[in-house]
Amino acid sequence: MKISELSPEYRQPPPHAGLIADLSKAVSDVESFAASATAPEKLAADLRRILTSLASAASSSSFTESLSVQIWRLGTRLWNAVVDRANSAALAGGPAALAVEAEIRQAAPELLLLAGIPNGVPSAAAKVASFFHRSGLAWLDLGRVDLASACFEKATPLVSAAATEDRGVLLELNLARARAASDAGDQALAVALLSRSKPLAAASPEGAKSLAQGYLSIGEATLAAKHSNPAVEASTLFTEALDLCEKAASPSSSSPRTPPYGGATPKTPNLEGLKRRCLRFLALERLQAQDYEGVLRCIRVSRASMGLEEEHPSIGVMAMRAWIGSGNMAEADKELERLMANALATENLCVSAAEAYLAAAGPEAARKVLIALAARCRAGGAAAAVRVVKQVIDGGGGGIGRARAIAELVSDERVVALFDGPGNTHERGTMHALLWNCGTEHFRAKNYDTSADLIERSMLYVSRDEESRSRRADCFRVLSICHIALQHLDRALEFVNEAYKVEPNIKCAFLKVKINLQKGEEDEAFKQMKTMVGCVDFNPEFLTLTAHEAMSCKSFGVAVASLSYLLGLYSAERPMPMPEVAVLRNLIELLSREPGTEAEILKYSRRAKQRMADLGVESFFGSGIVGGRELNWFADLSWNMGLRASKEKKYNFGSEFFELAAEFFSSRNAECDENRSKVCKALIMAVTIMLNAEELNNSPLSDSDIKKGVEMLSRAGKLLPLISPSVPVASDQLEANNFLYLHTFNSYQLMGRMGTPAHPQQLQLIKNFASSKACTPANLLTLGVTASKGALPNMLAAEFSLKACITTALASQSPNYRVISCALRKLACLAGLQDLNGSKSDAAYDVFQQAYQIVVGLKEGEYPVEEGQWLVATAWNMSCLPLRLHQAKVARKWMKMGLDLARHLEGMKERIASMQTTFENLERVSGDEPDECSQEEAPKASISGSMSQPVLV
């Protein structure tokens, strides 16, 4: 048996030994961070667990003195280890890692606070408060204001009633709490904490300096945040900071009742730097408030205590801005020069100040400022120049004067020299872009002279390497366009030639075409257009542009040629800039402005018809309203060209134009009555013009033309009912009647050319027309005259037409006696040429007898004089042949008819006497045989004499 078994251990382990062991192990892990593989997150978790356990144990029973001392020793070791970890670069990490380290740091004062204040530890409460203060600052640096405030609030009660030597910790806590409140946005609390710290700061100059720094820090935050609380003003905070600096610098500021620790005399801190910072921020606050005099006062005070080499660069910037705000540009210029002479001023600050100065001074001062910057900025001179030029450009007012100042500024050799070297490639490109954009703005404003100047200066910043070739060519082309707009055509040609040398392409070729057109050199324009078509980067759109340019220059030939060539490029696969139908329309529109172009217009109209047949109506003209407009344009154009050609007696063209019009009108909306009516009219007009061409050219129609005409009239005949207007309108009805007559007349004409006799059909055609409402006496007269002419006259049709003409005319309310007289004459001539009833004389006599019945009772002058004279003379002369044949009875009948007509017609009164004498002589010679054909009783008076035989008219 072992001794231990005989004498067992009855001693109890100390309380909380397990917690102490865990804590000791955790502290050891924290201390051995270089060799330990324990993750900081695990260390923080272990410490949280231990703190929770200790807090639970402390709540149940108080710690013994020895346990408190143990915890204090371990807490102190933990703090020292945390400090070592913070100083180690091996643990540097991101915000998350720093937050874990801050949590480990805070565990040390938490342990000390749990352990209580043991006896024998000097200033234990102040030490714990200091640890909490530094832990809170760590959280504050990480932006965790809530955790920082919690640390400060735990520390404050520990030292709030501390002895004099520990009051410094309380001051630091108040300043830290003020900073946390400021970061949280509670500026009022921050100011209250600072005010609460004034008695603490009064104990020593260092305390006053710390409080002044606190006021300055809170003032900066207030100024940056532009706090809206009127009770918290940045200027008040800066003034408080200045006052504290003054008190701290005063020898009487240290209280005799607060002797320094160890009996040493307090040393006055160096507050000049802090005072200058306060003055700078106070000047900045006054500058934001636009109190320019206040700014200048602050700067004077600041400068009174320092030399030029010590002046902060912001002083010069604020002084310059204050003088600008006061309107004193001369002093502002001096301040800018002083700033540039300050070695502490960065190049960026100098450029920013120059920008602000130029914004107020205007572009006139830019040259001087930029030259000064060129001398000041060694490394970033090009970037500075870019910023200055941009400020001048963006300074407002894009006038010509500003542009001229920019051009002079960027063309200075010293400025251009800043951009030399490969290191300034970016700045060089930026400067070029600035000038290019400025130039294009003036170009859009049509300030072409100014635009050309700026674009030309921008080329100073374009290198001549291969990469910049395209940019240089663009500049040359824009310069050419500017000079074209200014009508400096020779100069424009020089620039475009340079552009072509740098980068030959279609844009240059087009500009040459444009220049030649404006110079009126059409031959050269033609040559350049051919060159343009042969370019590698040829685009059909440039032919469209050429056509527009040629039209504006009134160069008809070039415009037509460009559109004609463009038309030849259309195919199913190739994308084109505009629809083929639009090209055809523009081309025809151009041709229609010039005389004698009917053949060309007809050619392209035929092409439109053919393409419509090949592609389909919608594929060629387009769909919807736009397509309908295009189609109607071609239809109306064909109709109008047909009318124009007919008016100019170019019947060959006119007929085909009307035929094309019919095709266009019939190609869409076949069910539309209006379109079908137009088709009918166009077909009738086409045949009408065809017959007119035959008559004008005195050449008979070919069999194919006759066949085509018959087909067109047959097609039109089916559509004739659609011509009549749905709403009776006099003008529309008259037009419809005219087309119905033309259809009848043309049909009659073509029937006579068919090669086979068609007299019955012709007669029936006229009868049908005579029975229609469209028939007029004038129409029937024309039909009758036409039927009586030609190689194969249709006498029956002629007689019917003429008789119907007379009947229709007499039946009207206002008979047209000129038409009636013409019909009577033609009918009389017909009667003289044929034997209707076996007796030629009887038929003719019937006509004259009808004429006599018509003229009896007419007013004087109502019947045409010349026609009346013809009737009288013809009737009288009809007696000549019977007299020679000794047919006295027939002769007497005709002489009597002539004499009776003369008595009722105007213009024959002077001849009645001689006619009466001749008639009486005839009766005397032939005996007293009664006249069976007498119309009236013979005159009682005997008239001797003879009447000359009138000529048959």
From Swiss-Prot:
Location (main, coarse)? nucleus
Q: Where in the cell is it found?
A: Nucleus; Chromosome
This chain's source organism reads: Oryza sativa subsp. indica
Q: Would the keyword Nucleus be found if you checked this record's keyword annotation?
A: yes
Pfam families reported for this sequence: SPO22
Annotated protein name in UniProt: TPR repeat-containing protein ZIP4
Q: Where is the composition biased (Polar residues)?
A: 943-953
> Which GO terms fall under biological process for this protein?
female meiotic nuclear division; homologous chromosome pairing at meiosis; male meiotic nuclear division; regulation of synaptonemal complex assembly; resolution of DNA recombination intermediates; resolution of meiotic recombination intermediates
The leader peptide range reads none
Which cellular component terms (GO) are annotated to the entry?
Answer: chromosome; nucleus
> Which residue intervals correspond to the TPR repeats?
129-162, 432-465, 473-506
